[in-house]
């Protein structure tokens, strides 16, 4: 980002003060969005916990250990797809479920990696994700068209990634 800023300064011959202001405005805006997502994920987890959904989810996984490795990646994947935010999905899952990984016979790193993969891939094909909306605008298509086009490869990536991460 800094290199790009310096190159744009040299090419456009803009005042350094104007470039600096734009650079730090952009950084602050991006940083604020990230903090907002993290806070929203924490509030979301609190809501899920308050409604008993987290306890029910953990109970279902404890009663059926065969689904744990699938839920560790598919749960955040679906959450990322529905919310358009892979970070919110991953933070929510890792805050609520991953601390219990050893109860499911997995390491925290293994379950956390599976959740990260799932959340990231879910956001990637979400028609309401910011990146999808921007790309659709550039291409002049509906965001759902991008989701349709990328759906099969992303689901295959989820399955392959889950398979390898589940091996431990």
Model-derived features: where do they sit?
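Re-entrant/interfacial helical elements at transmembrane boundaries that shape
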Residues: 56-57, 87-100, 129-139
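Loop-to-transmembrane-helix entry motif
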Residues: 26-34, 64-68, 118, 128, ...
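Structural signature of hydrophobic alpha-helical transmembrane segments
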Residues: 1-3, 56-66, 116-126
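Core transmembrane alpha-helical segments of multi-pass membrane transporters/permeases
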Residues: 2-53, 69, 78, 82
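Juxtamembrane and boundary regions of transmembrane helices in multi-pass small-molecule transporters
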Residues: 124-168
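Short amphipathic alpha-helical coupling elements at transmembrane boundaries
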Residues: 21-29, 56-63, 98-103, 144, ...
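Hydrophobic alpha-helical transmembrane segments of multi-pass integral membrane proteins
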Residues: 35-43, 48, 63-99, 103-104, ...
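Juxtamembrane helix-boundary/capping and inter-helix hinge elements in multi-pass membrane proteins
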Residues: 15-16, 29, 105-109, 135-145
